[in-house]
């Protein structure tokens, strides 16, 4: 992502920049795959009986699907912007579920969204106190998207309160000044 760049400043300074959407997608897929294998080995998870919810199914989300499908996990998908685009195009979109369904059914919820602060589908602090309090199971939360998609203060409290089983954090809110307690 490039949410940390001051695009207007770069334009004024005549500095050219580019981004490469999806360039690390396969690496993230491999990372999630290895996390699931580690959960199986060290925590005794039976992956064939594990439901994984993916929030965000763009370049990275698709790579994660391809990487974890062979493990036998059930995969549930949530991506409101893609669902809306498919619906408007008259294409099948029913496989995208509401967040509430992931909160109810998933043993693991993994975030793969850009950081969006405005508009119809904001992702800033998408996983916050309200999100955690609505969980029906005690899932593991994985964040490999942008740090501020998961409110780090709230995920820490959810861990302390036993609302979530564990958290796998690959990207932190306020990097490099991360929450050391988390």
Regions found by a protein language model. Name each.
Residues 1-45:
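Phosphate/diphosphate ligand-binding glycine-rich loop within oxidoreductases
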Residues 5, 27, 63, 150, ...:
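Residues that form or flank phosphate/diphosphate-binding pockets in enzymes
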Residues 9, 67, 131:
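Hydrophobic/aromatic ligand-binding patch that stacks against planar heteroaromatic rings
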Residues 35-72, 90:
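Glycine-rich NAD(P)-binding loop of Rossmann-like domains
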Residues 75-77:
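Short beta-strand "acidic-cap" motif of Rossmann-like dinucleotide-binding folds
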Residues 79-81:
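N-terminal Rossmann-fold cofactor-binding loop
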Residues 84-181:
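Rossmann-like adenosine-cofactor binding region
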């Amino acid at each position: 992502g490039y949410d940390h760049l001051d695009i207007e400043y770069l334009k004024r300074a005549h500095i050219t920049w580019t981004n490469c959407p999806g360039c690390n997608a396969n690496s993230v897929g491999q990372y999630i795959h290895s996390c699931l294998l580690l959960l199986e080995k060290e925590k005794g998870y039976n992956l064939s009986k594990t439901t994984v919810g993916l929030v965000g199914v763009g370049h990275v989300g698709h790579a994660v699907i391809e990487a974890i499908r062979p493990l036998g996990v059930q995969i549930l998908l949530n991506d409101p912007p893609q669902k809306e685009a498919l619906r408007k195009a008259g294409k099948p979109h029913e496989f995208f579920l509401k967040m509430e369904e992931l909160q109810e059914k998933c043993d693991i919820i993994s975030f793969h969204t850009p950081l969006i602060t405005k508009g119809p589908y904001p992702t800033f602090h998408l996983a916050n106190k309200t999100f955690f309090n609505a969980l029906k199971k005690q899932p593991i939360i994985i964040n490999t998207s942008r740090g501020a998609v998961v409110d780090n203060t709230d995920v820490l409290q959810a861990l302390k309160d036993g609302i979530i089983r564990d958290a796998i954090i690959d990207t932190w809110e306020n990097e490099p000044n991360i929450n050391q307690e988390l």
